[in-house]
Regions:
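Positively charged n-region of N-terminal signal peptides that target proteins for export
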Residues: 1-4
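Hydrophobic h-region of N-terminal signal peptides that target proteins for export
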Residues: 9-18
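Scaffold signal of the M16-like zinc-metallopeptidase fold and its non-catalytic homologs
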Residues: 20-23, 161-210, 231, 264
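An aromatic/glycine/proline-enriched structural segment found at the starts
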Residues: 21-28, 186, 215-266
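Extracytoplasmic
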Residues: 35-38, 44-47, 57-61, 65-67, ...
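M16/MPP (pitrilysin/insulinase) zinc-metallopeptidase core fold and M16-derived inactive scaffolds
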Residues: 63-123, 163, 184-187
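M16/insulysin-pitrilysin zinc metalloprotease superfamily fold
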Residues: 90-93, 121-151
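Acidic/histidine-enriched alpha-helical segments
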Residues: 100-105, 141-159, 170, 223, ...
Length: 266
């Protein structure tokens, strides 16, 4: 009996000691970061292309970024928002519904905006995904019907924020911080949106959606020599142009602390 008690006590002490061992385990080795050097080339129109082959997964991603200087939209604030909404609604070559159906069929993800585009999907569809992205970006289909729809959506979105203190405060904050004449301080309103016409959107696209300051980054399970041929074929026709480089004075600090109030009905 005495021997059994001694054994039980020893087991109890061992378990208790192990349970109280809260020392931090030794860290494992740091993961190795392997940053591959991209293959780069530039098209005659100024588009800069960076390609990184990564064969770990059968996927590919494309990112088109247009690095233009900021610009003021003035009394037509909202023209860039509407340009973003209209790019990608099909193309002059493919109707909107057919375009979207093919993107879904490929299981791809393609997005467009006023300063570029992005796409991703399975590498076996790499060429077709790039074709669709290039088509939507370079040959946008700007129609009055789609313009009116997107314009109404933008105005409706503003109306839903009219009683949101945080939303209004955020917009007013930019005006106070940068000034209403600075690109970062312009105030979007229903009035400025209504000032925008379809021709304004087309002009905005022609002026700022240009290849001179554009970068196309391609990463995935592709071969550089093959993707280069596709890029040259698809983006070569993009008309060479440079966006205007406007300059603005830097915002100045106020001379003394100010408290600004916005009268909210609620």
């Amino acid at each position: 009996m005495k021997k059994s008690l001694i054994i039980l006590a020893s087991l109890f002490l061992t378990i208790t000691t192990q349970a109280q061992d809260r020392s931090q385990p030794k860290p494992g080795p740091s993961p190795a970061i392997n940053l591959k050097k991209p293959t780069t080339f530039t098209l005659p129109n100024g588009l800069k292309v960076l390609v990184v082959e990564d064969h770990k997964l059968p996927r590919v991603s494309y990112s088109l970024s247009i690095d233009n200087a900021p610009y003021a939209e003035g009394d037509k604030k909202g023209v860039s928002d509407l340009t973003s909404s209209l790019i990608g609604n099909g193309s002059t070559k493919t109707p909107k519904d057919v375009f979207n159906e093919e993107v879904d069929f490929l299981g791809a993800n393609i997005n467009f905006y006023a300063s570029g585009a992005s796409a991703s999907g399975l590498s076996k569809h790499a060429t077709r995904i790039l074709e669709l992205m290039a088509e939507g970006a370079i040959m946008p289909n700007f129609t009055q019907e789609e313009f009116d729809k997107e314009k109404d959506k933008l105005i409706e979105g503003l109306k839903t924020q009219e009683k949101s203190v945080s939303a209004v405060a955020s917009r007013v904050e930019d005006v106070l911080a940068y000034g209403k004449n600075h690109p970062a301080g312009e105030y979007l309103s229903e009035e400025t949106i209504k000032n925008v016409s379809l021709s304004d959107v087309k002009q905005n696209y022609r002026t700022y959606f240009v290849p001179q300051n554009a970068y196309l980054v391609i990463i995935g399970d592709i071969k550089t020599k093959d993707i280069k041929k596709s890029v040259e074929k698809l983006f070569g026709p993009w008309v060479k142009a440079t966006a205007p480089n406007q300059t603005y004075s830097n915002p100045t600090n106020v001379q003394y602390t100010q408290i600004n109030f916005v009268d909210m009905p609620n």
